[in-house]
Each structure stands twice: as C-alpha cells, then as structure tokens.
Amino acid sequence: MTSFTGITAVANATNEMAMFKQAMKEVAAHPEWMSSRQIERQRWNPYSMEGGSTCAISGENFAIVASDTRMTQNDINILTRDAEKIQILNDNIILTTSGFYGDVLQLKKVLQSRLHKYRFDYRSDMSVDLCAELLSRNLYYRRFFPYYTGAILAGIDEHGKGAVFSYDPIGCIERLGYSASGAAEPMIIPFLDCQIGHVTLSEGYERPELTLDRAISLMKDSFRGAAEREISTGDKIHLVIAEAGKPVVVKFLPLRED
Amino acid sequence: MNAHDEVQRTLNPTCTGTSVIALQYKTGVVVLTDRVVSYGKMARYKNVSRQYKVNDNVLIAFGGDHADFHWLQNVIERQVLLWKRFDQDIGPKALHGYLTSLLYAKRCKMNPVWNTLVVAGVEEEEKNNKETSTPFIGVITQKGCAYQVKHIATGLGAFLLNQAVEDEWRKKGEDLSREEAEAVLRKSLELTLYHDCVADNEFEIGRVDATEGVVLGKEEKIIGDWSIAETNCQYE
Amino acid sequence: MWGETFDDFENDEGEMAMAKQNLIAEPARADFTFAKLPLGIQPVDFMKTHFAETAGKSMQFRKGTTTLAFVYEPATPADKGGIIVAVDSRASSGEYISSKSVMKILDIGDRMVATMAGGAADCQFWTRIVAKYCTLYELREKTSITVSAASKYFANTLYGYRGQGLSVGSMVAGYDKKGPQIFKVDSEGDRCQLKVCSVGSGSLNAYGILDNHYKPKMTDDEARKLGLRAIMHATYRDSGSGGVCNLCHITPTEKIRLPPMDVSKLWYEFADELGRDITYNPVE
C-alpha cells in the first residue's frame, strides 16, 4: 500500500487487473497440472487428408453426384482404389464428402441416424432442403474442433427440382447449380463455370440447355480432366444419378489409375 | 511452428509391430504378420503373435503400438461377451464398425490408439449357411479412417507391397485359392524383409475360412534370396 | 416414452400451464454445447494450425467481404427514404474464390436484415439464432423487436464466445418504432450505432466513395446508385470482394430486395455516367 490518493489506487488496480488477466491467459494456455505427455498429445495432428474430389450438378428435374474412389495417404501413396465418398441417404438425398475420411464416415453416421430418427418421428422421408440445414448446423456444432471435410449435399427438392448445396468445413451453406469439393475443386469448377455457367460466353450466343445427358458427360469430362492433372484423383468415377420420380441409379466408370 | 513440426513431436509409440499383409481368397481371408515387436529399431520381443482370434469368424491383426493393442484386446473381449449375452457372435463387419467408432472417439480426445488394425473374417449373411458367407477385410487407421478392401498391406508394406499384392490379386480375382494366396503373402514378406529393417523373417499366416473358421498359423521361417544384396549396395 | 396411457392425458393441463410459463419467461441465452477440444487446447491456436494457409485450399473457411449500409432521408416527397444495404457476393478460401454468389444480406425479421462479413459460417449461424430470438420476442410481447434490442442480443451472444476465434462483422439494419437504425456488431462483442457504416476487407474503399457522395437527404434513386457505386469501387480495389452487388432498400413501409447486379457491368455503367472513356488516358 503506497498511497491513498484515488488516482494511484485506480492505476494500481488496473495494473493488477491487467497482470491478473495475463496470468489467467497463461495458465489457461499452459496449465501447471498438464503433464508433458498431455502437452505432447496436443501437438499431435488429429487430421489427415485422404485426397479425392467430389462434384455435383443439378438440373431442372435431376441431380447428379460424382466422386472418385481413390484414397491416398499423404497425397502420395494409394491406400485403396474403391473408397466410397458418396452416401445415398434416402431416395432424394445424396451426401458426398471429401477430406479427412474419418470425419467423412462420422458425418455420414450422424446424418444417417438423424434421418432415421426423422423417419421414426414423422413417418416420412426428410426433404433435401431440411437435410441441408441440418447438415449445416451439424457442421457448425463442431465449430471449435471442425470436421475436416468439404461436403456437398444434392438431391431432388419438394418441387421436383434438382438441388445442390455446398458447404465449407464449418457449415457455411449455399444453394448452387453445381459445386465441387476436394483436391480438384479449383480444376473442376472453372470447367463447369465455362460449360454450365457460360461465364465466358458473350451475350447473344446460344446457350445449350443442361439436359441430364449433357450433365453426365460434363461430369465424366471434369473427372477425366482432373485425373489427368491432379495426383490424388483417379481410379474410378462413382456416379450417382437422381431423377425426379425415378429410383437412384449408381454407376462406376473407369478412370486413370496412375 | 509449422505443420510439419507437430508430426515430428508426436508422442511416439514404444513397442511396435510393422506390416500386416492380408489377402482375400475364394472362401476366406489369409493374414500374414511377422512375429517380432520392435523397440525403435531394436528387435525387442521375438516370438510374439500379432494376431488375435476374436471368435470363429473374426481375426484381428495389428500394426503399431503393442501396448495399445493389448488394451484393445480387452475392449474387444468385452464387446464379444456383450454380444454373447444376446446369444450372438460378433461378425467382422460389426466389429470393424465398432472399432472405427472407438478409434475415432479416441482421436477426438487427441488420445489416439496407435494402431493400424486389420479386421479379417468371414461375414455370415445367413445364420449357419456357410454357402452364402463372404470374406471380409476391413482396415482402420489410428485416426478412425476405415475402409474395406480385398487385399491390404499396412505399415511400410503400404509403400512396398500394395501394388505387388494388387497385381497378384487382379490376375485371379475372386477365384484365388488358399494356396495361391498364401504363396503371394510369403513372397510379400520376403519383399518386406529386404527393405523393412524392423521386419522379421519369422512369421505366421492366420486364416479365416468359411468352413474351417479361424485357424491361427504356426510359426514359420523364411530366409529369402540375399544374392540381390550384391546388386543393391553402395557401401563397399 | 414408448406410448401414452390414458392417465397421461390427464396431465395435459398441467403441461399446458408449464408450456405457457416457459413461453412467458425470457428465453435463456443461446446455450449451445459445441463439441470441444480436449482441455488445455486453445481453439484459436488449433484453427491457426489446421485451417490456415497450410491447409488445403478447400479446407479454409470462407470469408472476405465488402458490406455497407447507410441511413438517408427523402429529398422530395415522392421518395421513401430509409436504409440502403449493399453488399458484394464473393467468398474466398485463401486465394481460391469458393463462391461468387453468396447472399450476404440475411433476413432477421420482416423489417430487419443483418449483413455478413468475416467468417461466412459464423455469420449465417448466429444470425439465425438472433432471428429465432426476434421471432420468439414478437410472439411473446406481441410487438416487433427494436433494432437496438436485436443487435444487443446479437452482441451479447458473440461476447460470450469472445477470444474463441469467432469472426463476425455484422450490421443489423432495420426500421422500427424509433425509425431507421443501423447497428454494427462484431465478434469482439462491440456494438455501436451508426448512420453510415461499412464493414469488411473492402470497407475502406467503400468508405472513400460513401463519404464523398453521401448526403443526409437524397432521392431514392441517388441513394441506391450510391450503394451500388461504393460496392462497385470497393470490389475493384479489394481482391477479397467481387461478384455481384446485392442491394436491399428498407423503407418505412417495406423491404425491397433489388435484383443482383454484376459489378463488371456496373463498371461500364458508371464510366458512361461520368462521361469518361474506360481506357486509361494519361493526357487527361
């Protein structure tokens, strides 16, 4: 206790508070009880990247989803040539995820169980719009320990139209005409921008209509193109076609294996 | 600190096993592991089996930390007993799913089980009908990343052998016989032996067959052909 | 749990009373249980390690923006006045433009919007929480919530997560019984009322245009043009902004969302208006 004048007391108090806050911060970052083993543990990288790419295109009455089936270790070593990144959640919802495969599996499990419960509670299948919001929320719930995934949800909405929803790892949602995620995203998207978005076409030129056939060929092209230039994409195209009022069709098409 | 530092600073496993090689044949799965547990580069424990028989349908082989696998054996045993209470035998698919969740949950606590597990078995599609049973190989890495395969090599084998085993598999596919599959595995071990310094020449081949169930292998030895060493040394 | 017996129906009245009680009470602060990192790991450091530039391009969070809003009074009786909210539509993950068509004006109520700058997911999620609160408030109090109250709730919620790495820079703009109001709210818990406001990476460029041309009294056409102009110029100087310009005009009676305008086309429009050739002319 040095002085009783107000100013010094306040100054002391603020100073003390600042020091206290600093100490709190330090102790929160490095608690004393933490053993070196625990500190080591925290430096461990809980994520890995299994590579691969996924893409979805929606049209007037259809949505098609594709992914490659390669799974790599450190982007270099191919672990398996038939890892599936697409999950058909019900007749009109398809989830496709790239990124850390453990999270991909977890996300699939979370959505499957939520959809199951929805069926149990409401005795109907969930619509793709609802599921899209559900996924967004579930991604955000892991805001502070995110899923290391780029998810795309596609399907047929309540009006029979194709829908594609694109997400970032923590659940920023946007409905788009087409979307891609994963290692080859920066390659596939410009191609689709050109072919479907027609961003490079001047006004007054004819814009080809996006039919199912055209969408499928574009999808094949984009993956074959990506497999030529991207190391962790290849082996097989896993193609899922959802058309309004028709059952979901699944196809596997060959891709470069090198 | 950059991203690479933390990989290096990781809490390292102590006593480890190396590659597991497994291959599916017509009616079952063969699994090969060597019988050594290393402490760094030292061959610390010899004559240790790295395969664990869960029940008549499932066999688990591990690569990675030996202690963690022992802990896992306990957990698995409990799970098997739990199923027994409902008069069920746990199948390879179910166990694979369970272990995936377990390893993922441990990862989320940043306290990983330092194992790469290979769940080999025969999945019974219909109860007591061996005709419809299908062979199953499932792999789980320590981060909870799981997948099913027809053939697999883990550890250093993932780099050395995956393609070699795949090529053999593609020649015959589903029609591979047990003898042929075992021959492929023996050849593969020889290859790891040449290049993996913690691999051992004592090994065992376990198998899960639709009719015979799990048959744990006997200890075998391989010498290999070291004449290739002449062409592959830069240290004379 | 598994089924209802007839006895259960007798409890209905009690339950109704309970439900009413719950409805009258002020809803608790949004208490989400987010999955947490194990004790001792700082989320901010963790994100920096795994989701910053070192991560794959597609694994970075979407961000980057120019948003602006201003209040003006009608210059002539024919004009409506109110608030202009204008935003760009680019979301970038690092150097990669992960979306060029993001809607950054999010609805909170019939008469209120929030803009989105900073982490896209953070804004989307928390804006919905605020919207839910506002709707519940309206149902409970039978009057629409003031912009001030809504933004206060927003700021308080964000303050609860301060220092954990949220990234939100939002403007809550709307018309209520006190008139047109804009509140800027950010993830540090800051909240302040402004007449002219811009947030995001391109905000300084937007301010440059805005402060130059802003007048307290404007015609509707002038005001809308000003919003477009400021966004357009900001997108030309800030690489984190771009795409189309979305504009929302909140008048005393309604909320008008204008169709998106491509900023590349706007450039030519404004060049024409200035009577200037778009090619660079050093002599001039």
Swiss-Prot record, chain A:
It comes from the Eukaryota. Pfam families: Proteasome. Keywords: Cytoplasm, Nucleus, Proteasome. The keyword Nucleus applies. Gene3D superfamilies: Glutamine Phosphoribosylpyrophosphate, subunit 1, domain 1. One of its GO terms (biological process) is proteasome-mediated ubiquitin-dependent protein catabolic process. InterPro entries: Ntn_hydrolases_N, Proteasome_bsu_CS, Proteasome_sua/b, Proteasome_suB-type. GO terms for cellular component: cytosol; nucleus; proteasome core complex, beta-subunit complex. The keyword Cytoplasm applies. It is found in: Cytoplasm; Nucleus. Transmembrane segments: none annotated. Belongs to the peptidase T1B family. Non-catalytic component of the proteasome, a multicatalytic proteinase complex which is characterized by its ability to cleave peptides with Arg, Phe, Tyr, Leu, and Glu adjacent to the leaving group at neutral or slightly basic pH. The proteasome has an ATP-dependent proteolytic activity. The 26S proteasome consists of a 20S proteasome core and two 19S regulatory subunits. The 20S proteasome core is composed of 28 subunits that are arranged in four stacked rings, resulting in a barrel-shaped structure. The two end rings are each formed by seven alpha subunits, and the two central rings are each formed by seven beta subunits. The catalytic chamber with the active sites is on the inside of the barrel. This is Proteasome subunit beta type-1. It comes from Caenorhabditis elegans.
From Swiss-Prot, chain C:
It comes from the Eukaryota. Keywords: Cytoplasm, Hydrolase, Nucleus, Protease, Proteasome, Threonine protease, Zymogen. The keyword Mitochondrion does not apply. It catalyses: Cleavage of peptide bonds with very broad specificity. It is found in: Cytoplasm; Nucleus. Its EC number is 3.4.25.1. Disruption phenotype: No visible phenotype. Constitutive skn-1-dependent expression of the proteasomal subunit rpt-3. Double knockout with ddi-1, sel-1, sel-9, png-1 or skn-1a results in failed expression of the proteasomal subunit rpt-3. The active site is at T65. The 26S proteasome consists of a 20S proteasome core and two 19S regulatory subunits. The 20S proteasome core is composed of 28 subunits that are arranged in four stacked rings, resulting in a barrel-shaped structure. The two end rings are each formed by seven alpha subunits, and the two central rings are each formed by seven beta subunits. The catalytic chamber with the active sites is on the inside of the barrel. Component of the 20S core proteasome complex involved in the proteolytic degradation of most intracellular proteins. This complex plays numerous essential roles within the cell by associating with different regulatory particles. Associated with two 19S regulatory particles, forms the 26S proteasome and thus participates in the ATP-dependent degradation of ubiquitinated proteins. This is Proteasome subunit pbs-5. It comes from Caenorhabditis elegans.
